[in-house]
A protein has these predicted regions:
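FIC/Doc superfamily catalytic core
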Residues: 1-134
Length: 134
């Protein structure tokens, strides 16, 4: 329905901005209507991936209910979000290197957020899955 579609796109814009994209809702809607980047920021393609991932997740939950909320779905969503990333980036897989959320090339102590180290991701994701399925 129209309300869900609009809210999904607003969420996609806001979520992608966490990653540093510079797209607004109007630009996303124009891109979807025209399927072209003419006069739009390239980031709109990234933001559209968020829409696709959200739709995939919603469809899975509608089809299977809460049981859809498992690590297979999380990895599928990640693969959608990262499909335009560099070829050596593991799409739908957990990272093997420490990541930071902050300035490009920045140090962990200057980061806005430092996620769990790679050796703790499997354990954390299993905990997340258990919590989602409760």
């Amino acid at each position: 329905d129209m309300v869900t579609r609009t809210l999904a796109r607003r969420e996609a814009v806001q979520s992608s901005q966490i990653e540093g994209t510079q797209t607004n809702l109007d630009e996303l809607l124009v891109f979807e209507a025209t399927l072209g980047l003419d006069g739009l920021p390239a980031d709109v393609v990234v933001t559209e991936r968020y829409v696709q991932a959200l739709q995939l997740g919603l469809d899975a939950v509608r089809a299977r209910g809460r049981e859809a909320l498992d690590l297979t779905l999380v990895n599928q969503l990640h693969a959608v979000l990262m499909q335009d990333a560099a070829d050596d980036f593991p799409k739908g897989c957990y990272r093997q290197e420490q990541a930071i959320i902050g300035p490009l090339g920045g140090r962990p102590e200057d980061a806005r957020f430092v996620p769990s180290p790679p050796d703790r991701i499997d354990e954390g994701m299993r905990e997340l899955e258990r919590a989602m399925l409760k």
